[in-house]
Amino acid sequence: MSGNSANYDVGYPIYGAKFINEGTLLVAGGGGQFNSSFPNKITALKVNFQKKKHIRRFREITLDSIDDAPTSLDCNNNLILVGCNELFNDSSMENVNHHLRKFVFEQEHLKFVASIDFNRTTDPSVFTKFVYINQRATVAAIASSEVPTVIRIIDPRNLTENYEIETGREVNDLHFAPNGILLSYITSNSLEVASVRDGNFVARKTDFDKNLVLSNIRFLNDNTLLVAASLSNSDGVSLLKLGVSSKGVKILKTASFMFDLNGITSMDVSPNKKFVALSSNDNLVAIVSVEKLKLVQLVPRVHESTITKVTFSPDSRYLASTSMGNTINVLKLSGTSSSILRNIWKFFLNFVLLVVLAGAIQLGYKHNVHGFIYKHAHDIYKSKFKENTTIDQGSSSYFTINDDYRGITESADIISATDVASDIETEFSSFDTSTMRTTTEDEQKFVWISSSADSQFTSADIPTSASSSSSSSSSSFYEESVTNEPIVSSPTSEITKPLASPTEPNIVEKPSLPLNSESIDLLSSSSNSITEYPEPTPDLEEKLSSLIVEQSESEITTDRESVSKLLSTESPSLSHMPSSSSSSLSLSSSLTTSPTTALSTSTATAVTTTQTNPTNDAANTSFLDNSKPASTREIYKTKIITEVITKIEYRNIPASDSNAEAEQYVTTSSSMLLTPTDTMVSSPVSEIDPIASELERMVETPTHSISIASEFDSVASNLIPNEEILSTSASQDSISSHPSTFSDSSITSGFQSIEVSTVTSSVLASESIPSISDSTFSKFHSISEPVSSAIVETATSSFSKTETKTSRVIAFSTEDSERSSALIDNSEYTSVLADNLEPTSVLADNSEPTSVLADSSEPTSVFTDAVQSPKTSVGQSSLSESTNIEGTSMASMIFSSSGASIGALSDIGKGTLSVESASSTVAQPMPGVTTTAPSFVSSPHKISASSIDASGFVQKEIMIEVQSSKDSSEAFGVRHKISENVNTPVSRMLTTEMQASGTVDVTEDVSLSSEVISALNVEITSLPNPVAPPQTIAAPLNNNSNTNIVNDDNAVAGTVNYAGLHDEL
């Protein structure tokens, strides 16, 4: 313990000292009768180390000159007792000695109260040796210098004696317990503990070491005593910690200080019971720790003469010592330290140890001891862990994962998705996000692409769709890709990243399927040509139906060569139609476009989300922003994968200028039977790399394929806009107004038969016919579709073994109560249409069945001419002031061949059956066409066309599941391998999945362009009849109600945050 100290000379020898309070020290002394040169005084001093003068005289009382000097002093609670003999020359006072005097400290003044004689002797050699007051100042004990010592217990308040304790020996010191109940005193070799109430002895100890001379005693607490003793045969001091109990006194701890102290003249314990102060005969002050009985600080030569008293302040901050040399020393306690000698000794020991350690290290380095120690420890580690660790021989080492990295890239598949965010002007503002969620399951070694649930129906169950058209203007959504370099995934160790040209006005957003590179090559290319918007078909349900497509390894090489040739043959002349070079995605599947298989299956080789816009119209391109490049994302997958591609769009489109009100078209499929089945596309992956699978897990967020359907059901109702906007009519002269948009080119692309629940816009729309609502669905998955959505799911595939042919597509239409048949001028498709369309019948005028027949001998072109001629009346649109809406089912099917789309059968409600034509000569947008999808309600409604002026949302999700290879030939129909027998009809059992939901969609200025459809392609559009809830807040997939989509009239798109999904603007 270290601190500052201050000295003060009071001018007389000091025999007693005690702190009255934290800053006031009371001392007493004098020369006595034998040295009259020193006055006898009682002085109060102020101690404050914050002031310049740390100790100053505060109060003082001077005693009579004939009195003896004060020899003892104690105080508590401002009550002061001083032992001082008085001497009188008066003979009448010869037998009286008032040796005990009482003072009080009131209002910072010393006041004399009384004096009394308890010794009853006038011998001047007898003086008051000890005066002690308990902490509450209720009991005091005094003892004289007479031997044997008599201890008198008195009441300091009235100075009365209670009883006496005859010790029979000389008492060296005494002290009260903190509770004031016990009193302990010591002689040279014994200790006594007595009760203050009656004076009976409680405990006694007399068997101390004979070399110890007990000199001082203090209570640490009510049951613990600290005794200081000097050594009789040598220099030094011992401290003994004693415990007092009913069984006696027991030594708890002992410490000796041989070289530091020589005899003890005074002792005191700090009020906090942490330190004990000792003064020795050689004028040293030692501070010892009470807990460990170790020397904390030794202050040498504090006084020049013998130290008479040491005392602590009540707050334990100051330690004061007095001496016979008239001086007072006050030490401010601020820390812990030891004596100088002890510090020097510790430094010497540390230095020696440091030298020895340095020498040992140098010697060990010289003899390579550290090397032997390391080798020995390494051998122990290897022997211990290698014996207990068994490494699977079939798996790669945990510490050599980078060695197999090239193997990972060879076995992985590259999936590229391009997301573009562009600023668009005011009313043409749009908001589009794409999100993909994937789950993997490590069950099998083979990978298939399939949908979660499929449906099956025969070719006789041909669905129909309703169509309507009207004249309006619409905004175009334009995005751009970044290069025209294709993305080819081949079984090589290098990773080909897609590059894009920033100047190319083409946007293709492609979340494609992960397939093994040994079986299927993914081809994504973009050319200088402009891929144009198909007809806006707002998909309310998304359907993934496919059939197993297998191929041998020998056919893969040929397919790759054909893909390379196809990429190299980009021509600017094809810039106005969606050709194979501008397709979104191609899968070389080595399929033959035989006419016998054109309509027998619903087969798709890829799923691609394509959003493009015609840029020929300067009005549509004036507001486009081409300055922001696209970002490309590559994902490596080799395991069983389930993907959910979510698209959310926001459109703010003004109301239609048409005065006609909305009309509801209701259709039905009379004999469609849908049953669940497993649908798979592509060939299995021969091997799955385990490390690549681990890499895939880190890239994608896991989910479960079974839970996707339930998530769709739970949020579909919240994703439908509350405005129920019905269909409007379109001008029939729209096609003829753009005759330059028709060109001849083969369309060799695949469409993944995505379920579209909507009303297809067509210029061939005519008066609706009654329909029968008997179509059933096995399961409905509610997926909302945005207003004015123009998202078309397309996929392209290139075939090397079959030469694609271009054929004209004829549109079929039937007027009221009339039966019309359609013929195709291409003879090789005749048998297929006749085989598949013959059993199909549609009721016209509620009674007469209308059949669509195909005949190879008599091609009919009347409807083709009607499409190109603005004067030809295809049908009359049934428009009225208001139209009753009935919740019925509607479906449409679009047929296609390798060269072009064969057509689409549509049941357009009342009185008209039309087959929509996707002729190879049609590629230009039709101005003034408005497509509307009715909301699904169970009761009739009347909604005016003026209510169309509202914004809506579309959320579109495509779920793609990659499963293990299983034998599915027995499930839900017979499937044949196309690679083995492409001329044989694959199956008449169309495997598909129907997912249904409701939406409201209004689109203006929709372009009509040829849909990119492959040789084996059937597009089914169904319209179920669930009730749409009247709310616009779209709940996220995780049912988090706090995440909303805000739909306002200012065309501000709100961001949707899905838990576990990655949203991109």
Curated annotation (Swiss-Prot):
Residues 366-1065 are lumenal. The gene is SED4. This is Putative guanine nucleotide-exchange factor SED4. Residues 824-863 are annotated as: 4 X 10 AA tandem repeats. Residues 482-495 have a biased composition (Polar residues). Keywords: Endoplasmic reticulum, ER-Golgi transport, Glycoprotein, Golgi apparatus, GTPase activation, Membrane, Phosphoprotein, Protein transport, Repeat, Signal-anchor, Transmembrane, Transmembrane helix, Transport, WD repeat. Sequence repeats lie at residues 824-833, 834-843, 844-853, 854-863. It is found in: Endoplasmic reticulum membrane; Golgi apparatus membrane. It comes from Saccharomyces cerevisiae (strain ATCC 204508 / S288c).
